Amino acid sequence: MAKKIVAVIKLALQAGKANPAPPVGPALGQHGVNIMAFCKEYNARTQDKAGFVIPVEISVFEDRSFTFITKTPPASVLITKAAGIEKGSGESSKGSVGNISKSQLEEIAKTKLPDLNCTSIESAMKVIEGTARNMGISITE
């Protein structure tokens, strides 16, 4: 029989830099999970993605064991890296703060495709394009 899931914890952590300090410690500690075991496993799994924020979904079971799934970095992080800027515009309707090419947009869409609720690369590109537009980043040919 399968183990019963007690809790699902969602966190967004720097790749390869998880430590027992907040937010990781308190979130896992209240469910009795071995915090250091999670940190070591997460850091090992994400060390090749250094510099990105990687969302993680942790399933905690009745016997206090856990499994976790890492997701792809948020689209906004990928877009700001591609555009070479710190952050998006606070007022996207008043002008752009940077731009990305169609090829960069396609690359980001391919990266995000497993986590998006679409099947084709074209629809994924439209989703990412909308995110970029809301951040004040224009798309060039």
Swiss-Prot record:
Subunit structure and binding partners: Part of the ribosomal stalk of the 50S ribosomal subunit. Interacts with L10 and the large rRNA to form the base of the stalk. L10 forms an elongated spine to which L12 dimers bind in a sequential fashion forming a multimeric L10(L12)X complex.
GO cellular component: cytosolic large ribosomal subunit
MF term (GO), any: structural constituent of ribosome
Keywords: Methylation, Ribonucleoprotein, Ribosomal protein, RNA-binding, rRNA-binding
Source species: Prochlorococcus marinus (strain MIT 9515)
Keyword 4Fe-4S: no
NCBIfam families reported in the protein's UniProt record: L11_bact (TIGR01632)
Taxonomic lineage from the root: Bacteria, Bacillati, Cyanobacteriota, Cyanophyceae, Synechococcales
Family: Belongs to the universal ribosomal protein uL11 family.
Pfam family, one: Ribosomal_L11_N
InterPro entries per record: Ribosomal_uL11, Ribosomal_uL11_bac-typ, Ribosomal_uL11_C, Ribosomal_uL11_C_sf, Ribosomal_uL11_CS, Ribosomal_uL11_N, Ribosomal_uL11_N_sf
Protein modification: One or more lysine residues are methylated.
Gene Ontology process terms (BP): translation
Protein's UniProt name: Large ribosomal subunit protein uL11
Role: Forms part of the ribosomal stalk which helps the ribosome interact with GTP-bound translation factors.
